[in-house]
């Protein structure tokens, strides 16, 4: 029986059928690695969705940045509305890890800010994986970081049935063991409240509903689900499965074992420092660890508890830590890992371990942490790539690693469903590049189309932006310090024609879906390096591939080896695309992508502004507006539009003060 129910208005076209067939056969033949080489705009995401539906396995889709993760999450939610599509990225809005700089004798405390919505989504992902098979998780590099033992997590979860005998007080203690906190005043995620013989539990992985358990003596009489906002009963249940409020929650037996294990390690390390006559390190470690042990004994947690993860999970020193992969593979279940934009993602994954180890080794050496803190780490690249699962690498420009691992299990997806060709390209002398490009931009703007320009340095980007603005062009500059929300706003403004030209350095490559862009200009294309490598050039040139008038200008004094290889790849693909179009009588059409959904949120904003301008709003009307806005705020948070959710939250606060 199929696990996944794929819904889409699209039909397969171009190279999609053969790519899906090739890769699905490879996966069903139990091959460990396979690669999809798909050009920009060829519908790789839809191909991935079809492969998931046909292979019928829980799937982890990994990407190298949060922006692309959010985009993939939105697309897969639409493709699989009846399945569990989850989102797993870092839950920190801000994170400064603890560190020590010996030459300055400077210890920097850990400082972080946890995003409540992202934490909920992470918990939702792990609970779905433990309870269901029809799960697709969209994840960032966070999937490689340590989590609690999934088997311990299963032990802590609790199935509650109507009619079963349970001591009321022991049930409350069980909730505390599961990581829930009792709070009679502020009832929100991860908390519970007890009123008479009723216990309300707000699951940590759900912000829309809470569960009410009604007792009659020591017997559970009724279980009901309530709407968290309206506080009205939605449905009654015969039983309910309640999961822990934390991915690090453990039972009392495991907790006691962990405390004993930490004490034993502390004794050994203190003995080492004493023998080395390192009194400062001895006292520092003793004081810090004993304080943490007191907190763990009293509350089950402490600040920086992740540094003791090995003791809670039962892992041996240097053993591979538990991570999201272990939740996918629970019960020896087969699963698929899709690495999107693998040419960037895999190198990023490879560099994580070394940086983490360098910082923590200093903390251990100087007595700030026990040696077991080194085992709270991301996966080493070898551990990641040799996980007991199947991998599908997806990229327009895969590296040698992906192709060597995949051997013959490689599928090309060069033909676009729209018939669009890889863009024409032209090399021009860089001596007069600013004036020459200005003339080209005017022609593009006259056609109501947009331009992307990539430079090598921040200074050149700023100066170019200044020059073109003075010459009358509507131009913006996007630099590396701009966060994801502002970046999305700039891209949206470009699509809405609030300006015509966007200049950047390394922000114009992967994942930018801009059908309005018909001209991409690459300044100083002959300066060999990361930003002008074969892969970077092909990715950048691909930004013009969603428009029928797509064209790339490369300004250079010579043609480098990277340029030559990029030209050969583009020429090969374009020839194959032209041949397919001619054979099937296809006329290339510019991709169209609606902005209606993005604009809808702005309509809500306008309504709020009008409401706030009123000097007097009747109390009944004000409560109605607040309730409506609160509902929209929750919807925005669910859809990962946190900017809009925060805006709505602030406006609700203003209304409550009227």
Swiss-Prot record:
- Is DNA damage found in the keyword set? yes
Q: Which GO terms describe its molecular function?
A: ATP binding; ATP hydrolysis activity; DNA binding; excinuclease ABC activity; helicase activity
Ranges for domain Helicase C-terminal come to 433-607
Organism classification, top ranks?
Bacteria, Pseudomonadati, Campylobacterota, Epsilonproteobacteria, Campylobacterales
Question: Where does motif Beta-hairpin map?
Answer: 91-114
Chief location of this protein within or outside the cell: cytoplasm
- State where ATP binds: 38-45
Record protein name field: UvrABC system protein B
Its domain of life? Answer: Bacteria
- Name where it's found: Cytoplasm
Q: What is known of its domains?
A: The beta-hairpin motif is involved in DNA binding.
Helicase ATP-binding domain boundaries? 25-178
Database matches in SUPFAM superfamilies: C-terminal UvrC-binding domain of UvrB, P-loop containing nucleoside triphosphate hydrolases
Xref: InterPro entries? Helicase/UvrB_N, Helicase_ATP-bd, Helicase_C-like, P-loop_NTPase, UVR_dom, UVR_dom_sf, UvrB, UvrB_inter
Share what the entry says about its subunit structure, partners included.
Forms a heterotetramer with UvrA during the search for lesions. Interacts with UvrC in an incision complex.
Which PANTHER family is this protein grouped with?
Answer: UVRABC SYSTEM PROTEIN B (PTHR24029:SF0)
Keywords of the record, alphabetical order, are: ATP-binding, Cytoplasm, DNA damage, DNA excision, DNA repair, Excision nuclease, Helicase, Hydrolase, Nucleotide-binding, SOS response
Which GO terms fall under biological process for this protein? nucleotide-excision repair; SOS response
């Amino acid at each position: 029986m199929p696990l996944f129910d794929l819904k889409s208005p699209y039909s397969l076209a171009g190279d999609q059928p053969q790519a899906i067939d090739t890769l699905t056969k490879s996966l069903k033949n139990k091959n460990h690695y396979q690669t999809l080489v798909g050009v920009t705009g060829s519908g790789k995401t839809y191909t991935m969705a079809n492969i998931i539906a046909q292979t019928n396995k829980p799937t982890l889709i990994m990407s190298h940045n949060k922006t692309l993760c959010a985009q993939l999450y939105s697309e897969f939610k639409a493709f699989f509305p009846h399945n569990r599509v989850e989102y797993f990225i870092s839950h920190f809005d801000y994170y400064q890890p603890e560190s020590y700089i010996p030459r300055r004798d400077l210890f920097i405390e850990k400082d972080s800010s946890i995003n409540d919505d992202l934490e909920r989504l992470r918990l939702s992902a792990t609970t779905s994986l433990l309870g269901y098979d029809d799960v697709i998780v969209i994840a960032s590099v966070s999937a490689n970081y340590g989590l609690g033992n999934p088997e311990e997590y299963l032990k802590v979860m609790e199935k509650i049935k109507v009619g079963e005998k349970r001591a009321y007080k022991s049930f409350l203690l069980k909730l505390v063991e599961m990581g829930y906190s009792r709070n009679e005043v502020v009832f929100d995620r991860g908390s519970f409240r007890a009123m008479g013989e009723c216990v309300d539990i707000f699951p940590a992985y759900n912000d829309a509903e809470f569960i009410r358990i009604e007792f009659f003596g020591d017997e559970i009489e009724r279980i009901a689900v309530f709407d968290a906002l309206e506080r009205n009963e939605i449905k009654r249940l015969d039983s309910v499965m309640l999961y822990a409020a934390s991915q690090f929650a453990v039972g009392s037996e495991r907790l006691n074992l962990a405390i004993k294990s930490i004490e034993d390690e502390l004794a050994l390390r203190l003995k080492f420092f004493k023998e080395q006559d390192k009194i400062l390190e001895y006292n520092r470690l003793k004081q810090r660890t004993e304080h943490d042990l007191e907190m763990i004994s009293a509350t089950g947690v402490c600040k920086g508890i992740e540094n003791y993860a090995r003791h809670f999970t039962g892992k041996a020193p240097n053993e591979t830590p538990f991570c999201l992969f272990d939740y996918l593979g629970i019960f020896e279940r087969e699963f698929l890992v899709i690495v999107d934009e693998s040419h960037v993602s895999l190198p990023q994954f490879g560099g994580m371990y070394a940086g983490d180890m360098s910082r923590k080794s200093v903390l251990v050496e100087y007595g700030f942490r026990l040696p077991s803190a080194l085992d709270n780490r991301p996966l080493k690249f070898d551990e990641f790539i040799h996980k007991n699962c199947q991998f599908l690498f997806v990229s327009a420009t895969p590296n040698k690693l992906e192709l060597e691992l995949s051997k013959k299990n490689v599928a090309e997806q060069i033909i676009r469903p729209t018939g669009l060709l890889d863009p024409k390209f032209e090399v021009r002398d860089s001596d007069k590049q600013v004036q020459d490009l200005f003339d080209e931009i005017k022609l593009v703007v006259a056609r109501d189309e947009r331009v992307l320009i990539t430079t090598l340095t921040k200074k050149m980007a700023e100066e170019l932006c200044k020059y073109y603005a003075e010459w009358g062009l509507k131009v913006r500059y996007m630099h590396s310090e701009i966060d994801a929300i502002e970046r999305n706003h700039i891209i949206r403004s470009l699509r809405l024609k609030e300006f015509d030209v966007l200049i950047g350095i390394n922000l114009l490559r992967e994942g930018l879906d801009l059908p309005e862009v018909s001209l991409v200009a690459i300044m100083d294309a002959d300066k060999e390096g990361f930003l002008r490598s074969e892969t970077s050039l092909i990715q950048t040139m691909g930004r013009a591939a969603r428009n029928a008038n797509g064209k790339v200008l490369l300004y250079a004094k010579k043609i480098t080896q990277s340029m030559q290889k990029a030209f050969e790849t583009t020429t090969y693909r374009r020839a194959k695309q032209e041949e397919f179009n001619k054979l099937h009588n296809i006329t290339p059409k510019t991709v169209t992508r609606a902005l209606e959904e993005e604009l809808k949120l702005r309509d809500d904003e306008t309504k709020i502004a009008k409401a706030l301008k009123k000097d007097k709003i009747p109390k009944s009307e004000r409560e109605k507006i607040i309730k409506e806005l609160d509902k929209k705020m929750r919807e925005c948070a669910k859809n990962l539009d946190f900017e809009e959710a925060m805006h709505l939250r602030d406006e609700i606060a203003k209304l409550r003060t009227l």
